[in-house]
């Protein structure tokens, strides 16, 4: 797959400066999908990763190993083995103190998601990109990672190839992404992990309230056939 170059623009808002990454206007947004090694991104955009920035794209960062801090909308999250972050477009983020990291990163536009089945697309958006608590991340165990590695390998192999039919290639990537995200939903350690390590006190109060409502609903509403 031909590697696409993201355009970079410096934005200043309320005396805060950050970088904006977006697809070039002449790039086909329905067929764009990129999967890259995290270390490759780190080497190419070392300074950009440390500065506050956002993508006008959906992105997934899966850290196989390493440590550091991921800042999302000014809240800090710990990076550890198996951590996966799911970011919707325009989430402001930065990385600090990345050490011995290894993993993959994927990004794709809104139009690419339209290639995924409507029902599954809704589940993916609600669970991963627009959850009630505002930001989602999970842990993938080594055993679960081994089960997902064949899908990731197929994505990486397809990314290295040139396809004349870009639409067919995009559909193939959408199918593989669907399988990968389904496995992450099934095998990932979610729990209330999306609520932890957020530095904002008000956010923690909100998170506990959401958890109490969900627990109370489950306790008082039996599932009926």
For the regions a protein language model found, what residue spans apply to each?
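Amphipathic, well-ordered alpha-helical segments in soluble domains
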Residues: 59, 147-154, 176, 180-183
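Generic protein-terminus/edge-of-domain signal
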Residues: 1-71, 75-77
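Short, charged/polar surface micro-motifs in flexible loops or helix N-caps
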Residues: 41, 65-67, 90-92, 110-114
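A hydrophobic/aromatic-rich effector-binding and dimerization subdomain
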Residues: 2-11, 16-27, 97-163, 190
